[in-house]
Amino acid sequence: MEVKDLKPALIWQCFDEITKVPRPSRHEEQIRKFLLDFAAAHNLAAKTDAVGNVVMTKPATPGCENAPTVILQAHMDMVAEKNNDVKHDFMKDPIDTYIDGDWVKARGTTLGADNGIGMAACMAALIDKDLVHGPLECLFTVNEEIGLEGAINLGEGMITGKILINLDSEDDGEIFVGCAGGIDTTAIFHYRRSVAPEHFHFLKVSVSGLLGGHSGGDIHQGRANANKLIARFLWGLSQEHEVAVCEFNGGNLRNAIPREACAVFGIHGEAKQTVADALDAFAREIQGEFAGIEPSVKFDIESIERPAYCIDSDTSLRLIRALYSAPHGVYSMSRDLPGLVETSTNLAAVKMEEGDTIKVTTSQRSSVESRKFDIAHQVEAHFQLAGAEVSHSDGYPGWAPNMKSPIMKIAAEAYEELFDVKPAIKAIHAGLECGLFLETRPELDMVSFGPTMTGVHSPDEQLNIPTVEKFWRHLELTLAKVAKS
């Protein structure tokens, strides 16, 4: 069986088509054309704004014309992550999907169920002739994964409804009514090139096989950070030997826990075997520390040719110290909602860049606005102590829970009616676009829900098939209840 053959047919057929269209962040041209072609093929009104967001509208079911307009919202872009041994061009290749038991997966890449299944639900709602609903507006935003840019720059008048259902959540049985705000902090190290010592032996050390995951939704899992592990190993070596660091690269995305990292470094030739022994001991140490959490962590080391140059010793030492000691993970838990992470930080990526610079990207989140800035400023101070230039993104606000929300009540009643169990009403430690919509439309009544998926923002991403049917039925009944309210 293929993905397009799954039931309910409409949502799975739409999702299957979406997986064939390249749509990494900042490159939504093809998926936008796909959406506009879809609208034209089904005689749906559609419009775009200056940044490329798309809205499609559908008239109410006959007899429901006076019902309130509902906005269904999802984002177009996907996180483009792949394993190092996988050949895949996210700019032109379709996602290679397959079914494994109750799960839809992708071979060696992110699946894009975040937020492809939300897009598919919007599309299915637009063409389902049996759906009962009031006026519908389906909003597809751009560049959500790199800072919620589509929501930040949403064109005036693009949406008119006062009820919004965000379809970008990842846990069946949970209805979200709040989310964290976020801000990115970037540190730039400038270095001088120094001649690679002739009497040094040069090696490349790497770590792979980590689970990674979403820097909001998975940060509480205590998973290993590839950048931290490589920095820790190099720092340990530097306590006993002179280490000449030539390269350091790890992670890719601000909102993903880094799964892989590597460094090129030199050490006195006679210490070559010492390094191999040290890595073996370090690997055993890490496997013990993360037993039951990181079952597939793998370290590799190989000899390489002497590089043209290394990072100057002063910058090299400051960089390794800063990465090793940088904060990462959960900073504090919510005192109001048990089990909810309040504040966190993610040491997301380290990249060698042009102009003899090294760029360190971090991402901070908090459901308390002042603490969002506090943790960002702590990260700033940390890297300033290491001599880096530090800057912050504009950030985005959180979404404060409204426990008296009418749409929350309707969505909860619909779920319980269908499945004979009360859904959990929650806030999420991740950035949803809802908080940004509230800034310009404070009257909006909003919820977020979706099917179960795990491993998002990593090649381990998978979408649970049975919960997609539940998600669709939940959306159907919620829309019908709003139409009849």
List each model region and its residues.
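Zn-dependent metallopeptidase/amidohydrolase metal-coordination segment
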Residues: 7-11, 335, 342-355, 363, ...
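A short beta-alpha structural unit
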Residues: 16-20, 264, 298-310, 348-350, ...
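Active-site metal-coordination/substrate-binding segment of hydrolases
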Residues: 64-146, 151-162, 188, 202, ...
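Fold-level recognition of mixed alpha/beta catalytic cores in primary-metabolism enzymes, strongest
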Residues: 136-226, 234-238
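His/Asp/Glu-rich mid-to-C-terminal helical/loop segments that flank catalytic regions of hydrolases
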Residues: 157, 223-240, 267-272, 315-324, ...
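Acidic-enriched catalytic cores of C-N bond-cleaving enzymes acting on peptides and small amides
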Residues: 178, 195-200, 219-249, 269-344, ...
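Active-site-adjacent substrate-binding region
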Residues: 225-227, 232-248, 393-395, 401-444
